[in-house]
């Protein structure tokens, strides 16, 4: 058995965000400095995973709610964009690199999750191809920099889960969500609209296309704020909104439902909403971003 430490490189640095540590640090600081911390300490956040030029300022609204003084483990749940996956997958590395500093995977928690038999392992190739987890690493590193040697991460790639699987994984993760020293980061963009996404829902009563998209997204966001996994599934079945992190969101909502059964009182609020551009005709396309935080009362 070799004790060689295996690292996942910051494969999207230099394209989706800058590979320069000082420049990245300055950008993240700039976005975070423009935001209020109102929902601190967040127990979970939902934030986007696009290139930082598109969604960096939106994501700051979620990361500003993270309290580094109490957070010791960060679960990052991201959807799989490239490989078909019907369950959830764990990384096969020890370290996730970022241009700021390296993040350590919590092998103890990984061991607990692996023992359930509910997970598979992703290859290094799959890990480095996927951006849904990586885009949260620089923000995680920045939010936690005052306690950078005192926390670990638990990256989880979430497959195209059935509703019953979302319930099972929600139940499993609920015991971790109950712990105030854990933070859940749920990685999701919202509507992907336009011909290139093969999605062009339009409610003309809303006026311009971008207003219809916003109305559709905010309908989904308000269901998430009600913390109701069944209504969220029904909304997706009815409108087919292209929310790429629908399964990680479903897992979070089911974990919350499990804790509410045990009398835990929580609330979720979205704090920011943005679109990559404003669609006005059928040739246009856009991606929507939303940032929000879950707090425990």
From Swiss-Prot:
Domain of life: Eukaryota
Effect of residue 81 to A: Abolishes interaction with ERBB2
Pfam families: Memo
Biological processes per GO annotation: regulation of microtubule-based process
Assembly notes: Interacts with ERBB2 phosphorylated on 'Tyr-1248'.
Family note: Belongs to the MEMO1 family.
Protein name, per record: Protein MEMO1
Species: Homo sapiens (Human)
Lineage of the species this protein comes from: Eukaryota, Metazoa, Chordata, Craniata, Vertebrata
Gene: MEMO1
């Amino acid at each position: 058995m070799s004790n060689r430490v295996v690292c996942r490189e910051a494969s999207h640095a230099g394209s989706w965000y800058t590979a320069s540590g000082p420049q990245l640090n300055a950008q993240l600081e700039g976005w975070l400095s423009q935001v209020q911390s109102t929902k601190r300490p967040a127990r979970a956040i939902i934030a986007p995973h696009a290139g930082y030029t598109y969604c960096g300022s939106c994501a700051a609204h979620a990361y500003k709610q993270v309290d580094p003084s109490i957070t010791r483990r960060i679960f990052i749940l991201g959807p799989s964009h490239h490989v078909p996956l019907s369950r959830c997958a764990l990384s096969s590395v020890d370290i996730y690199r970022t241009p700021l500093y390296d993040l350590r995977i919590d092998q103890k928690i990984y061991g607990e999750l692996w023992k359930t038999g509910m997970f598979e392992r992703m290859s290094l190739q799959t890990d480095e191809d996927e951006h849904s987890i990586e885009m949260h690493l620089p923000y995680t590193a920045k939010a936690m920099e005052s306690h950078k040697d005192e926390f670990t991460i638990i990256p989880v790639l979430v497959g195209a889960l059935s509703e019953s699987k979302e319930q099972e994984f929600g139940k499993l993760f609920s015991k971790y969500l109950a712990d105030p020293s854990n933070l859940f980061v749920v990685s999701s963009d919202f509507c992907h609209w336009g011909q290139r996404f093969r999605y062009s829902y339009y409610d003309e009563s809303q006026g311009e296309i971008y207003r219809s998209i916003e109305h559709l997204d905010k309908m989904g966001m308000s269901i998430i704020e009600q913390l109701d996994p069944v209504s969220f599934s029904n909304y997706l079945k009815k409108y087919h909104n292209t929310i790429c992190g629908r399964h990680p969101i479903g897992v979070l909502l089911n974990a919350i439902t499990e804790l509410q059964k045990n009398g835990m009182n929580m609330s979720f609020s979205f704090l920011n909403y943005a679109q990559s551009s404003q669609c006005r005709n059928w040739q246009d396309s856009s991606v929507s971003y939303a940032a929000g935080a879950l707090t425990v009362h």
